Amino acid sequence: NVQDPETGRLSYGGLLSPHTNKLKGMGRPPVDGAPRSCDTLNGNCVLIPHRVAERVGNLDGIFTHKMGDMDYGYRCVQAGASLCATGVYVGTCERHGEPDPWRRPGATLRERYRALIGPKGLPVREWKEFCRRYAGPWWVLYWLAPYVKALALPRG
């Protein structure tokens, strides 16, 4: 777990996926001093045992940003590894940008579209592959949903 140096809040770390659909309801374990099991990660400070790295390989080159971390964590678990968040902060890292900038009220259609398909959003090819791997049999709906929502939002 790393914390934002300005706010003191958790910026990146382990992620919990309480549903069988790994794209629904992502949460974070508490930073309360106790190590916690995780389903995947969004990590800026991650230790991977050599035997796991040999089995899983490196980050998948199809992903350029956050989905790469999450995909790697899921692949580690699929390979039989356990993921654990430390329960304490081990470093600092600013939270990079607002979450889901394409949802920002008042943004024009063009601004929402650019933010959505940009590297910190949900680039079409990457999001499609991520959904195909982890959203189950209805993955196409999960893949299309953010694009439809972003384009359908009323201008503010």
Q: Where are the regions a protein language model picked out?
A:
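Short, hinge-like loop/turn segments at secondary-structure boundaries
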Residues: 13-19, 101-104
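A recurrent flexible, glycine/aromatic-enriched loop bordering the glycosyltransferase active site
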Residues: 26-48, 112-116
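Active-site-adjacent helix/loop segment of glycosyltransferases
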Residues: 74-155
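A short, conserved alpha-helix in the catalytic core of glycosyltransferases
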Residues: 40-41, 46-57, 62-89
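NAD(P)-dependent short-chain dehydrogenase/reductase
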Residues: 15-24, 39
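Residue-level signal for pocket-adjacent positions within structured domains
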Residues: 11, 33-36, 54, 58
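Short beta-strand-to-loop element that shapes/binds the nucleotide-sugar donor at the catalytic cleft/hinge
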Residues: 1-16
